[in-house]
Structure formats: C-alpha cells, structure tokens
Amino acid sequence: MKTYDLIVIGTGPGGYPAAIRGAQLGLKVLAVEAAEVGGVCLNVGCIPTKALLHAAETVHHLKGAEGFGLKAKPELDLKKLGAWRDGVVKKLTGGVAGLLKGNKVELLRGFARFKGPREIEVNGETYGAQSFIIATGSEPMPLKGFPFGEDVWDSTRALRVEEGIPKRLLVIGGGAVGLELGQIYHRLGSEVTLIEYMPEILPAGDRETAALLRKALEKEGLKVRTGTKAVGYEKKQDGLHVLLEAAQGGSQEEIVVDKILVAVGRRPRTEGLGLEKAGVKVDERGFIQVNARMETSAPGVYAIGDVARPPLLAHKAMKEGLVAAENAAGKNALFDFQVPSVVYTGPEWAGVGLTEEEARKAGYNVKVGKFPFSASGRALTLGGAEGLIKVVGDAETDLLLGVFVVGPQAGELIAEATLALEMGATVSDLGLTIHPHPTLSEGLMEAAEALHKQAIHILNR
C-alpha cells in the first residue's frame, strides 16, 4: 500500500489549492481526480459561463452602440464561439495540471472510495494517508417532473451553445446560474422566460438590489416571474407545453417553449465515497458536517467546498482548501466566513456581509448609505448608469456590516468591501479612503459618506 501525508479527493477550485498548499508545507501529497482537473468550476461552471457571458455582452453592446455613433450588426458564429470557450478552459486546466506537477503533487486519475478511517481505494489499489481532504464538489439538482434530457437541460448542457439557440427558453430558478444563463441565451437570440418559486430573484440576497437587477433584466426583454413554480410539461408538435402555477397554489397557466433549463440549485456529490466507513457524518441535506477548521466527524478527515456546506462558491472552496491543508500540516487555521457573492449578469450584482434585514434581526441599530451609478461620471462614460452601491452599518459603533452592489463591474468592486469587513473596518474608514477619479470605486466611498449624510455628489436626505 502506498502511503502519503495527505490525500486530496477532487481537484476542483478547493481541491487543487489544498493539494498545492499541503505540498508547500512539506507534505507528501496525492491528488485523486475522477473526471477533469479543475472540477466543475473550471470545466463546466464558472469559467465557460463567464466566457459566454462576455461574448453575449459584446453582442449586446454592439447592438446598442448606435447611441454613441457606432453602427454595427454583429453576426455570430456559434461553432467559433464554442471553440473559443473550450480554448479558454483548456488553457486554464493545463495551467492547473502544471501547477500540481510543479509543486510535486502526485496526480492519480480514478474514483476514490474510503475502505476505512485511513485508507481509500482507487482503481483497485489501496492508498493510505495521515490526513484526507474531501473536495468532491456538487452536481445539478433535479426537479420533479423535469428529468434531464434532450428537452430539459441542466447547467452543463446549457453551455453547449454551438448546438443551437432555442427560439423560446424557459429557465426554472432565479439564482445566479439561472440568471446568468438566461441572459446569455436572451442576448444570443432566445425569447427567455425565467421563473422563481420565491417572491424575488436572488432570494438569499439583499432585496433592494435584487429588485433593481430584476428591473434591469426586464427592461432588456427577459420575462421574469416570481412566486411561480413549474408543475410539469408535455411535448407536443408545436413545442413543450409547460404548466405553471402560483407558488402557494391556485392560478395555473400554460406556456409553450422549445427548451427548458432547470437551475434550482446543486447537491453535494458524496455517493459512492464510502463516508460511513471513514466515520464521516452528513447533515439532513447531504452536506458533510464540518467545523471552522474544516474538520469532519472523523479525525484526520477534512471536507471543503460544495460537498461541505453552502454557499456553493469556488472562492469559498479555495479558502476552505487552504485552511484544511494548513491544519493537516499541523497549523491552527480557521475559516473566516466573510464570503462575497457575485452574479455576472449585465448589470452585475454582488454582495458581502449582512443585509439590512439580517442586521436588524441580529440586533444592530442599522443605518444605510446609498450611491446611485447615475451620479457616477465613470459609470456614465461606460454606458452603465443603472444600479447603486449600498452600505449597511451599525449606527452605534459605525461598524461596517455589509455592502451590496448592482451595476457595472460589481464583482470587482465587492473585493474592497470584503477586505474592509475582514479587517473590521468602520463605515468611516471607507469614506476616509481616497479613491481615484473617475472610477466606479468612488461610489463605495460616496455610499459610505451618504450613510453619514456627507456624500458630495448626491443630495443627502
């Protein structure tokens, strides 16, 4: 039996950084991968989706460029688009494999299953280690009455735009995945209807900024319906007849589409891992139970990323992987749960920390500052004046509690807010920081000043 200091099961955005960090700290590391290096995010998630979003955004901007004197009628070659998307993925997966090799991490292809607390089996061979990190990720959640297939897509199938753009598309799910893919297909020519069971899209996010995103999407032409569920569908000659119903029951309506995209969430991928043989416990939803050190119920076994707990985000998985690897090497690392979220629509949405509602429930005396992008010179020059930046703070201590953005490049802007929260900054700290002009980042400074009714470029009310 070959033995190692650390075995990492899965090489996604949590697994490969964990393996590299373990090797950096002097551990003998084996990384086991059942599919493709880079995991869901790199191969069939974050990266290919963002590539398609960029292409769709370019098409959208060209169609609207006449306003500043550019007349263009873009013609899209879907096969070339698919090849470009795959090229981006291939370059990055090759880079990850090179990083593993360069850090002397041994890579083994195959499916790993636990044989006991300190042993796994891969391809019929047994491997042992002092520590294990489970980083097996997640898979699309199915929806009753909508089995995945030719007519009902999951998020992975939806990436294959080169196979054709449906004339009419129903997207079930108003979270990040549904919104991003829905807008991609809308901008590439589909008539898109998006439904969400909850009263608003992005139900876990800030309500005000989520409502502004919905308004922007509807203005662009997407049909967004909340408080709605899909009951079932029937395939007929003229398309897929889908029965929709109010979320709380009652009124029903039938719509006809050509394809259905189910994006109602993801579930942890643990089937066949033999967790019970290792003594690893899962919760009622199937997520592996972990503490702040990423330790499971089994000594020496860690779990990270989507398989461990929400939110299911690549950057969260990466940080958790580093924490787990450092603890496997004898350090005392803890996971700080200041995790930003981004939706890469146009306009983008991003948030970190507590929403207004969450802060009030937590007992804070909440104050809010807002700065609209319509007052931002840089936003206007980019043609993206929709949306705002919202700062949530505690009136008594001035402690920064949360920041939410809907507007251009929100995903880039939220990084500064995340750093501020991680450092325990006050709202005044953001306002006192000199920001370059003209930039979108000035809006964060102005929103912080607006909380104290001292913003310069809007009237303080």
UniProtKB/Swiss-Prot annotation:
Its main location: membrane. Binds 1 FAD per subunit. The active site is at 437 (proton acceptor). Optimum pH is 6.5. InterPro entries: Class-I_Pyr_Nuc-Dis_Oxidored (IPR050151), FAD/NAD-bd_sf (IPR036188), FAD/NAD-binding_dom (IPR023753), FAD/NAD-linked_Rdtase_dimer_sf (IPR016156), Lipoamide_DH (IPR006258), Pyr_nuc-diS_OxRdtase (IPR001100), Pyr_nucl-diS_OxRdtase_dimer (IPR004099), Pyr_OxRdtase_I_AS (IPR012999). GO terms for biological process: 2-oxoglutarate metabolic process. Pfam families: Pyr_redox_2, Pyr_redox_dim. It is a peripheral membrane protein. GO terms for molecular function: dihydrolipoyl dehydrogenase (NADH) activity; flavin adenine dinucleotide binding. The active site is a redox-active disulfide bond. Has chromate reductase activity. Belongs to the class-I pyridine nucleotide-disulfide oxidoreductase family. This is Dihydrolipoyl dehydrogenase. It comes from Thermus scotoductus (strain ATCC 700910 / SA-01). The lineage of its organism: Bacteria, Thermotogati, Deinococcota, Deinococci, Thermales.
